[in-house]
Amino acid sequence: MENQTMSNNIPTELKYVASHEWLRLEEDGTITVGITHHAQELLGDIVFVELPEVGANLAAEEQSGVVESVKAASDVYAPIAGEVVAVNDDLPGAPETANSDPYGAGWFFKIKPANPADYDGLLTAEQYAGEVD
């Protein structure tokens, strides 16, 4: 499937949650998580990122990190239950990457879902667009 983006910077191939995290299902069954373009826009210039620990078992909607900007601090939530299998080690040293490339190099962590079927029930790009309009 070709990657497409809605006019409001919401890639159509990803899944979303109302707390403004995006999810991408990888070929190995893990899920990459980051904050959306909308979230980084609301936050402004991001100056600090705290990520979860590799090996942490997170419940869906459990706080998994923190993002601080010049305007505000915001919690990051696990959009799906599972075990953290990787974190973006480059992000704490270059938190502005979450602003400049939120769907690419600005990813936060990868999680091995406790129940892979949970991914299917998350918001589509169109549904998420309805949440932020």
UniProtKB/Swiss-Prot annotation:
<dbReference type="InterPro" id="IPR033753">
    <property type="entry name" value="GCV_H/Fam206"/>
</dbReference>
<comment type="subunit">
    <text>The glycine cleavage system is composed of four proteins: P, T, L and H.</text>
</comment>
<comment type="similarity">
    <text>Belongs to the GcvH family.</text>
</comment>
<dbReference type="Pfam" id="PF01597">
    <property type="entry name" value="GCV_H"/>
</dbReference>
<dbReference type="GO" id="GO:0005960">
    <property type="term" value="C:glycine cleavage complex"/>
</dbReference>
<dbReference type="GO" id="GO:0019464">
    <property type="term" value="P:glycine decarboxylation via glycine cleavage system"/>
</dbReference>
<keyword id="KW-0450">Lipoyl</keyword>
<dbReference type="InterPro" id="IPR011053">
    <property type="entry name" value="Single_hybrid_motif"/>
</dbReference>
<dbReference type="InterPro" id="IPR000089">
    <property type="entry name" value="Biotin_lipoyl"/>
</dbReference>
<feature type="domain" description="Lipoyl-binding">
    <location>
        <begin position="30"/>
        <end position="112"/>
    </location>
</feature>
<feature type="modified residue" description="N6-lipoyllysine">
    <location>
        <position position="71"/>
    </location>
</feature>
<comment type="function">
    <text>The glycine cleavage system catalyzes the degradation of glycine. The H protein shuttles the methylamine group of glycine from the P protein to the T protein.</text>
</comment>
<dbReference type="InterPro" id="IPR002930">
    <property type="entry name" value="GCV_H"/>
</dbReference>
<dbReference type="InterPro" id="IPR017453">
    <property type="entry name" value="GCV_H_sub"/>
</dbReference>
<protein>
    <recommendedName>
        <fullName>Glycine cleavage system H protein</fullName>
    </recommendedName>
</protein>
<dbReference type="GO" id="GO:0005829">
    <property type="term" value="C:cytosol"/>
</dbReference>
